[in-house]
C-alpha cells in the first residue's frame, strides 16, 4: 500500500497556466515568458558590464596619460564626464541596433525561403504532413502566446531600463575611474560593482520561478537590481504602479549618482600620487 501511495505521488502532472487579457482567457506558457525575460535581462547585463567598464577604462587612461588636463581647459569636468558616458552609450546602442537589424533580416530571409519552398510541388506533401505533427502545434501555440504578450510595453520598458541601468552604473564607474592613478587599481573598485550586478543577474533568473515573490518585488524597486529583475517580471504582468515607481527610483538614483560622481570626477582627474581606497 505504501508503494502505491509513493507511485501516485510521483505521477507527473501537467499544469496549464492561464492568462487573463482584455480579450478574455488565454492559455500561457511560463517557459516562453521566462525565455523572453531572460533574454532581455542578459542583454542589459552584458551591455552595462561591457560599456560601463569601457567608461571606467577610458577615464583612467585619459588621467594616466594626462590628456584630461588639456580637455578640462576647454570644457567643465562634469560636461566631459557626461559626454563620455553618453558617447560610449550611443556606440553601444548603435551596435545593438545593428544586431537587431541583422536578426530581422535573417528572419525575413528565412521566411521568404520557407514561403518559396511551400510552392514546390515536390515538398507540398511533406509540408502538409509536417503540419499535422505535434511540433507544428507547439509552434502555433508558441506564436499564439508570444502574440498575447504586451510587446509595446515590453519594448518601451526595455529601453527605459536599458538607458537607466547604463547611466547608473556608468556614472559610478566614471567616478571610480577618476579616483585611481593606475589602471591596475581599478580592480578593487570594479569588484564590488561586478558582485552587485551578478547578484542582480541571478536574482532576475530566480524571479522567473516566482515573479511575484518577495525577492522579485523588492529587487524591482532597488535601482541597482531593478533593470535586470523587472525585465524578467514584465512578461508575466506587473502592476502599473510598480513599473512607474521602479522607473522613477531608477532614474532618480541615476541622476543623484551622476551628480555625486561628477564631484568625484572633478577632483579626482587632477589628483595624482595618492593611493585610492574604498
Regions found by a protein language model. Give the residues of each.
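Transport-system extracytoplasmic interface segments
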Residues: 1-46, 50
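Membrane-spanning alpha-helical segments of multipass transporters and channels
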Residues: 2-3, 106, 110-278
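Long, highly hydrophobic alpha-helical transmembrane signal-anchor segments
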Residues: 17-33, 69-75, 80, 222-229, ...
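Membrane-helix interfacial "entry" motifs
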Residues: 26, 30, 34, 38, ...
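Helical mechanochemical/support elements of P-loop NTPase systems and associated helical scaffolds
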Residues: 35, 51, 55, 63, ...
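Residue-level hotspots within the lipid-embedded alpha helices of multi-pass solute transporters
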Residues: 42, 46, 54, 58, ...
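Transmembrane helix boundary and interhelical loop/hinge segments in multi-pass membrane proteins
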Residues: 52-77
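Alpha-helical transmembrane segments of multi-pass membrane proteins
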Residues: 78, 82-99, 103, 157, ...
Amino acid at each position: 500500500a505504501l508503494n502505491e501511495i509513493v507511485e501516485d505521488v510521483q505521477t507527473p502532472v501537467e499544469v496549464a497556466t492561464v492568462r487573463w487579457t482584455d480579450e478574455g482567457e488565454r492559455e500561457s506558457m511560463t517557459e516562453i515568458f521566462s525565455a523572453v525575460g531572460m533574454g532581455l535581462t542578459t542583454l542589459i547585463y552584458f551591455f552595462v558590464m561591457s560599456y560601463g567598464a569601457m567608461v571606467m577604462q577610458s577615464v583612467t587612461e585619459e588621467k594616466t596619460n594626462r590628456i584630461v588636463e588639456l580637455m578640462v581647459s576647454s570644457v567643465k569636468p562634469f560636461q566631459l564626464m557626461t559626454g563620455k558616458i553618453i558617447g560610449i552609450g550611443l556606440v553601444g546602442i548603435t551596435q545593438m541596433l545593428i544586431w537587431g537589424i541583422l536578426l530581422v533580416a535573417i528572419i525575413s530571409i528565412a521566411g521568404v525561403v520557407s514561403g518559396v519552398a511551400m510552392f514546390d510541388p515536390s515538398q507540398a506533401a511533406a509540408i502538409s504532413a509536417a503540419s499535422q505533427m505535434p511540433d507544428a502545434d507547439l509552434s502555433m501555440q508558441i506564436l499564439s502566446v508570444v502574440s498575447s504578450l504586451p510587446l509595446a510595453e515590453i519594448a518601451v520598458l526595455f529601453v527605459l531600463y536599458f538607458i537607466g541601468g547604463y547611466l547608473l552604473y556608468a556614472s559610478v564607474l566614471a567616478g571610480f575611474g577618476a579616483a585611481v592613478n593606475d589602471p591596475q587599481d581599478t580592480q578593487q573598485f570594479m569588484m564590488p560593482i561586478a558582485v552587485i550586478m551578478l547578484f542582480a543577474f541571478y536574482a532576475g533568473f530566480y524571479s522567473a520561478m516566482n515573479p511575484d515573490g518577495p525577492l522579485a518585488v523588492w529587487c524591482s524597486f532597488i535601482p541597482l537590481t531593478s533593470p535586470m529583475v523587472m525585465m524578467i517580471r514584465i512578461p508575466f504582468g506587473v502592476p502599473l504602479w510598480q513599473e512607474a515607481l521602479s522607473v522613477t527610483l531608477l532614474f532618480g538614483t541615476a541622476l543623484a549618482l551622476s551628480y555625486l560622481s561628477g564631484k568625484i570626477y572633478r577632483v579626482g582627474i587632477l589628483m595624482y600620487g595618492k593611493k585610492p581606497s574604498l
